[in-house]
Amino acid sequence: MTFYFYFVINMEKVAIYIIGDIVLAENTGKALKKWRNLFNIQQIELAKYLNVSPSVISDYEVGRRKNPGVNIIKKYVLALIEIDKEKGGQTIKALKRILDKSPSMKAILSIKEYENPITLNEFVNIIDGEIAVGDNSDTPIYGHTVVDSIKAILEMTGDDFYHLYGWTTERALIFTNVSTGRSPMVAVRVSIMKPRVVVLQGINKDKIDSLALKLAEIDNIPLITTHLDTKELIKRLNEIK
């Protein structure tokens, strides 16, 4: 019984956060679509659960219908959560980890989810990056996390590492103050969860450790370098909508 109430409380916490994010968003429709995409749920699947036609979901998301009230937003969000629970609750668990993040997460310098995904090619241009491994320019990126690699190694536990992925693993995981890239790629390799792309800041492409390159190839993760200083890098990343 105790576990049940703990689970319910945490679900309410997640739901309240998402509802608040949608209500306060400048564009409600885009916010609805963003969260549906983060849960990796198709319009037709959500419409079936809510017992409405897919066109109704589409109309709200693209703004053809007037902004939905709080009750409709609540039903929309609770449906996302229930569908995710039926699939194992992986997204809910990720959200909970972020909302309950520990004090040791000082290593995270910036974390953000994008309203609309951008391609790997667009992302590389934004950060003045060079691709060391991989060439899939159409790879979608839904967010980013910038982490101080030294603090991460010294302060973060294995459980803390999962906080780096925000609401979704479909993101760029960016390590600053990198010397060879070996430690970040080893950390990614041993983790069950994998980012969409890894960025190493402050290192030349030809200076990346051979093992780091090999691990990126094994996990099929694009590996990028950038020479932007940390402040400018975060500034550009935070300008992505």
From Swiss-Prot:
Q: Which Gene3D superfamilies match?
A: lambda repressor-like DNA-binding domains
Q: Work out whether the entry's keyword set contains Plastid.
A: no
Name the Gene Ontology molecular function terms of this record.
DNA binding
Q: Which residues form the HTH cro/C1-type domain?
A: 32-86
Q: Name one Pfam family in it.
A: HTH_3
Write the record's keywords in alphabetical order, separated by commas: DNA-binding, Transcription, Transcription regulation
What is the top-level taxon of the source organism?
Answer: Archaea
Q: Which residues bind DNA?
A: 43-62
- Keyword check for Zinc: no
Known InterPro entries for this protein? Cro/C1-type_HTH, Lambda_DNA-bd_dom_sf, Tscrpt_reg_HTH_MJ1545_prd
Its protein name is Uncharacterized HTH-type transcriptional regulator MJ1545
Q: What is the lineage of its organism?
A: Archaea, Methanobacteriati, Methanobacteriota, Methanomada group, Methanococci
